[in-house]
From Swiss-Prot:
The lineage of its organism: Bacteria, Pseudomonadati, Myxococcota, Myxococcia, Myxococcales. GO terms for molecular function: nickel cation binding; urease activity. Ni(2+) 2 binds at residues 221, 250, 276. This is Urease subunit alpha. The active site is at 324 (proton donor).
Length: 571
């Protein structure tokens, strides 16, 4: 006996399907489901009187290698590669397959390797959005409490540097020296996120740089507060080329050792990741933003300037003074701070993100940025551009899928590619670590419902633990079993340079996390930034700070109101 369901009925039971549209949070962004990998009439649904029971959707006697440890049923996947509905299968902490799960003995179209058996746990994904765990590549490790804020926001990988609230760490994302790298790998072993450390890259000779990589750094960071001279840039990049690691750079705001063109010349066509590319967070004033037009530069933003609002300029001065050890009573320190803050370039940054010319988003945690707002600020920027610029020219249909895919790539796949993490994290595809985030559409971009680390729930919206059911207030983002005990180490990764594994010292640190070498960091270019590979010809007027891309003036008004803001965080 067959029965026909209208779209509303179907979505209520099984979640949205091909052609259905829904809004992301309270933004102006609307997605449309592009395809559905499940099978109509044979959908997997768990619960009393439902499908995933023995002999029905659950198979008996299947080979263990084909049985899933976890199935997320009927989830709406939002990834750089597409927006589609699927069952998501997890085995041994990794994504096993995307498609149709269930019992092939009685169900049509079950994807190979997606059998539901007696060893399978289930998460009901009907009506939920699933994304890859976010990656924040600009972490100042000022306090360990950042990890809780990050994972609660949907970020599962932290890459950066520091040793705690030291003056150097407050200003620069560097973990300097082999001893500090070793201690910080041991300290961050207790954090329920993947971690990679950046060593100090400021040296005009290579010896001290390579030593940090052998000790376990996953890359190097050049920062102006340590002296980002052309000689230091060249030496750091030479070491990176020899060791297949990424270099991140914060250039010389004061233009003491050279201007933007001098740093670009020092890059010499070699791959480099430019932090806070607009410049309010630091960099050649006023035209570091020019690097968005360089094919070897992988540009990112930090979230204090995301998006441009009526409050952005005012809040930056105090942040700069604190983070960079400045004295506001000294005219030269005040001039240094004020030289960075330019409404014209911040406005242009919004537009460059929308064009796909700035490829990544990050936080600058506790050093002008907010670690728990990478995801939120990304979608606020997307919303602002949707309202101010309309649909992207390449959209096909009455939706914002291209823009949504472009913006999700900025904090998932692109930072993974840039820093050599993409074999493990950054996208929802088979073989990747099951770092997955589930969202209720109304709360998308603000409050994840569940955060999985390596296939185990590590953080979740959870009610009163003394209640009779999980939902009574106060419902808060709380740590779950995946963030505890030895499960933490079994579901997280410590990223290191390949030289560290070859040297062998890092294996003696006693880490519980799996050690993974970064790879594929060199020879990258803007062309490798998914959906964010635009290479406009950039011009910056040194007097007015006006920014042009391919001759077009980049301008937008500051926002007075944003989505995903106070209404989501009253409690």
């Amino acid at each position: 006996m067959s029965r026909t369901l209208d779209r509303r009925q179907y979505a209520q039971i099984y979640g949205p399907t091909t052609g259905d549209r829904l809004r992301l949070g309270d933004t102006a962004l609307v997605l449309e489901v592009e395809r559905d990998l499940t099978t109509y009439g044979d959908e997997c649904v768990f619960g009393g009187g439902k499908v995933l029971r023995d002999g029905m959707g659950q198979a008996a006697g299947a080979p263990p290698a084909q049985v899933l440890d976890l199935v997320i049923t009927n989830a709406l996947v939002v990834d750089h590669a597409g927006i589609f509905k699927a069952d998501v299968g997890v085995r041994a902490g990794r994504i096993a397959a995307l498609g149709k799960a269930g019992n092939p003995g009685v169900m049509a179209g079950v994807t190979p390797g997606m059998i539901v058996g007696p060893g399978t746990e289930v998460i009901a994904g009907e009506g939920l959005i699933l994304t890859a765990g976010g990656i924040d590549t600009h972490i100042h490790f000022v306090s360990p409490q950042q990890a809780a804020e990050a994972i609660a926001s949907g970020v599962t990988t932290l890459l950066g540097g520091g040793t705690g609230p030291a003056t150097g760490t407050n200003a620069t994302t560097c973990t300097p020296g082999a001893w500090n790298v070793a201690r910080m790998l041991q300290a961050t072993d207790a954090l329920p996120v993947n971690v990679g450390l950046l060593g100090k890259g400021n040296a005009s000779s290579p010896e001290g740089l390579a030593e940090q990589l052998r000790a376990g750094a996953a890359g190097l960071k050049l920062h102006e507060d340590w002296g980002t001279t052309p000689a230091a840039i060249d030496a750091c990049l030479r070491v990176a080329e020899a060791h297949d690691v990424q270099v991140a750079i914060h250039t010389d705001t004061l233009n003491e050792s050279g201007c933007a063109e001098d740093s670009i010349a020092a890059f010499a066509g070699r791959t480099i990741h430019t932090f806070h590319t607009e410049g309010a967070g630091g960099g050649h004033a006023p035209d570091i933003i020019r690097v968005c037009g360089e094919p070897n530069v992988l540009p990112s933003s930090t979230n204090p300037t995301r998006p441009f609002t009526v409050n952005t300029l005012d809040e930056h001065l105090d942040m700069l003074v604190v983070c960079h050890h400045l004295d506001p009573s000294l005219p030269e320190d005040l001039a240094f701070a004020e030289s960075r803050i330019r409404g014209e370039t911040i406005a242009a940054e919004d537009v460059l993100h929308d064009l796909g010319a700035i490829s990544m988003m990050s936080s600058d945690s506790q050093a002008m940025g907010r670690v728990g707002e990478v995801v939120t600020r990304t979608w606020q920027t997307a919303d602002k551009m949707r309202r101010q610029r309309g649909r992207l020219p390449g959209e096909r249909g009455d939706h914002d899928n291209l823009r949504i895919r472009r913006y999700v790539a900025k904090y998932t796949v692109n930072p993974a590619v840039a820093h050599g993490l993409a074999d493990e994290v950054g996208s929802v595809e088979p073989g990747k670590l099951a770092d997955l985030v589930l969202w209720r559409p109304a709360f998308f971009g603000a409050k994840p419902e569940l955060v999985l680390k390596g296939g185990l729930i590590a953080w979740a919206q959870m009610g009163d633990a003394n209640a009779s059911i999980p939902t009574p207030q106060p419902v808060l983002a709380r740590p779950m079993f995946g963030a505890l005990g030895r499960a933490l180490g079994a579901t997280c990764v410590a990223f290191v340079a390949g030289a560290a594994l070859e040297d062998g010292a890092v294996q003696g640190y006693g880490l519980s996390k799996r050690l993974v070498a970064v790879r594929g960091c060199r020879g990258l270019g803007k062309r490798d930034m998914r959906l964010n590979d635009a290479l406009p010809r950039m011009e910056v007027d040194p007097e007015t700070y006006e920014v042009r891309a391919d001759g077009e003036l980049l301008r937008c008004e500051p926002a007075a109101r944003l989505p995903l803001a106070q209404r989501y965080f009253l409690f």
